[in-house]
């Protein structure tokens, strides 16, 4: 499946080379991107990173729009240098002129949020649940103390967790 994506990167570069009548160095392509971003262009490393999960779930649009979007960042950087805005007129020129695509800044793919465990802390106040992140819960275990803003008592772990 990533072979189609790599082929689309190559096609985008060939289009840019035909349009600008010059060669561009090919980037390294990585699929080590997670979370909400569909793709990232690392300008100084000449590296493209893509979110394989979002690619699998939105293959057609991803190949057409997202790959061209990220390649356009590298091409714009190689043509115009560091002093351009990420989604500025130079990048937009490449999206419209070279790839004949709308210069959309963001994707609208459904992104699965990961489940997060919250650790419930309490104080003597009524209805005083304080959901702590795993990081804050760990800090409490290391000796950090948190106080209730109302009663100024130390918050105590209730032994309960909640998945959000």
Curated annotation (Swiss-Prot):
What's the name of the protein?
Answer: Protein SprT
Sequence positions that bind Zn(2+): 69, 73
What does the cofactor field's note say?
Answer: Binds 1 zinc ion.
The entry's keywords: Cytoplasm, Metal-binding, Zinc
Provide the active-site residues from the annotation.
70
Q: Where in the cell is it found?
A: Cytoplasm
Q: Please provide an example of a Pfam family that matches this protein in its UniProt record.
A: SprT-like
């Amino acid at each position: 499946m990533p072979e189609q994506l790599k082929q689309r990167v190559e096609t985008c570069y060939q289009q840019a080379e035909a349009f600008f009548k010059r060669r561009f160095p090919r980037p390294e392509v990585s699929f080590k991107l997670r979370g909400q971003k569909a793709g990232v262009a690392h300008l100084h490393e000449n590296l493209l990173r893509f979110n394989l999960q979002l690619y699998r779930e939105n293959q057609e649009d991803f190949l057409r729009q997202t790959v061209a979007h990220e390649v356009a960042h590298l091409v714009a950087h190689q043509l115009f240098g560091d002093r351009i805005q990420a989604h500025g007129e130079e990048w937009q020129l490449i999206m419209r002129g070279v790839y004949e695509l709308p210069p959309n800044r963001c994707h609208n793919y459904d992104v699965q949020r990961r489940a997060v465990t919250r650790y419930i802390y309490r104080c003597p106040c009524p209805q005083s649940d304080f959901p702590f992140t795993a990081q804050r819960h760990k800090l409490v275990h290391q000796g950090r103390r948190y106080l209730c803003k109302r009663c100024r008592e130390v918050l105590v772990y209730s032994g309960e967790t909640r998945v959000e």
